[in-house]
């Protein structure tokens, strides 16, 4: 009887020991992975949504655009290699929080709500939200969008602005071009997207037009994880230097055909 009790105790001890060893190895693996991410000082990870021409879009399988070249300049000034993670726009801030990316450079407008969850750089572009309608539409301003069906890109300030319109039925899409395709197909009454992408994409839809008066005005900035002031300061320094030495104006000329920021 005593022998059986001893064996049971030994088995229990062995089980507990094996369990503790397994837990220790799991914790070690997690710490090693976290350490490898935090110590990977040669890489700067940019998160973006490459459906936002001319700021970020794909050309020959590569993500290119105004924001990409801005991020490349920041990485170069820091002595790092830029790595780009293309993801859904509404997944960018969660990716910052989890440490999947170092910064979100995606034509992201600064809002009080976003500032609760992220740290922003100095603004680098003045933008606005534009209303797009069919050329034969009688809609001429934001007030005539009341009780209309409006297509937007999910998680954007255009999405937020449209949602505030009285009685509006907002239809969300993963990318701005999808919203315009829905409008061109006659499935919605209007679309609301940012001004620069609107001008780029509407040129491919002969049946659509942009209403002159903007729905709202805003500023684009780079988003960082809360508390990452060091990286934000690096970005601010690069942006300021680019504006001072003409590189910023050269980017505007390359992607917008003018060396001046376009007025909202």
Residue ranges and their predicted role:
Residues 50, 125-133, 195, 199-240, ...:
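Periplasmic-binding protein-like
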Residues 80, 109, 122-163, 167-170:
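A conserved helix-loop-strand patch within extracytoplasmic ligand-binding domains
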Residues 84-94, 154-157, 171-185, 218:
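Short helix-initiation/N-cap motifs at beta->coil->alpha
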Residues 37-107:
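Extracytoplasmic small-molecule ligand-binding "clamshell" domains
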Residues 29, 68-77, 143, 149, ...:
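Extended ligand-binding regions for polar small-molecule ligands
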Residues 92-107, 115-127, 211:
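Short beta-strand-centered segments that line the small-molecule binding cleft or hinge
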Residues 17-31, 157-174, 209-214, 237-264:
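Ligand-binding clefts/hinges and TM-proximal coupling segments of bilobed small-molecule sensing domains
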Residues 94, 108-116, 161, 184, ...:
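A ligand-binding cleft/hinge motif common to bilobed small-molecule-binding domains
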